[in-house]
């Protein structure tokens, strides 16, 4: 009986963990953005503009390139960065913890502050809208 309960508990925990990972990271960002009464949705256009906007020293495109379908290179470490656009890298934006971690780190590096929920949602919306035939200015 104990063994059956343990297996059932383990199965429930694994299901909960897989559902948590399957949740779209944009869902949590959307919930946070909705706390602002002026929020009316995310904008790919604003996301593209933020991607190219220079912060204190860099822009997102400094390391990630202007074309998010291509791999980038970290300016300081020289490490290769996989493409940001899901069309080139389907694993992008599939893990909410990673999305949160990297937005915190990169927004601080680029803008010397954390990005707002709207800014994060705008960037993800733009990156998800990029197709193989998209024209990137």
Located regions from the model:
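N-terminal signal peptide c-region/cleavage motif recognized by signal peptidases
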Residues: 15-19
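Gly/Gly-Pro-rich "capping" loops immediately C-terminal to redox-active cysteine motifs
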Residues: 40-42, 52-55, 61-99
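Stable alpha-helical elements in mature extracytoplasmic
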Residues: 43-46, 59, 95, 99, ...
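Mature soluble domains of exported/periplasmic/lumenal proteins and thiol-rich metal-chelating peptides
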Residues: 26, 30, 69-75, 134-137
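Cleavable N-terminal signal peptides
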Residues: 9-10, 20
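Electrostatic cytochrome c docking/interface patches
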Residues: 23-55, 111
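C-terminal capping alpha-helices of c-type cytochrome domains
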Residues: 100-137
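Bacterial N-terminal signal peptides that target proteins for export
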Residues: 1-8
């Amino acid at each position: 009986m104990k063994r059956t309960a343990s297996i059932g508990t383990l199965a429930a925990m694994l299901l909960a963990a897989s559902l948590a990972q399957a949740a779209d990271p944009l869902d949590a960002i959307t919930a946070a953005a909705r706390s602002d009464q002026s929020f009316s949705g995310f904008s790919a256009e604003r996301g593209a503009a933020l991607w190219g906007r220079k912060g204190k020293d860099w822009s997102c495109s400094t390391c990630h390139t202007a074309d998010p379908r291509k791999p980038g290179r970290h300016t300081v470490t020289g490490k290769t960065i996989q493409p940001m656009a899901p069309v080139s890298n389907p694993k992008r934006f599939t893990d909410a913890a990673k999305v949160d971690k990297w937005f915190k780190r990169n927004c601080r590096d680029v803008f010397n502050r954390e990005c707002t929920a709207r800014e994060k949602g705008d960037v993800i919306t733009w990156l998800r809208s990029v197709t193989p035939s998209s024209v990137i200015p």
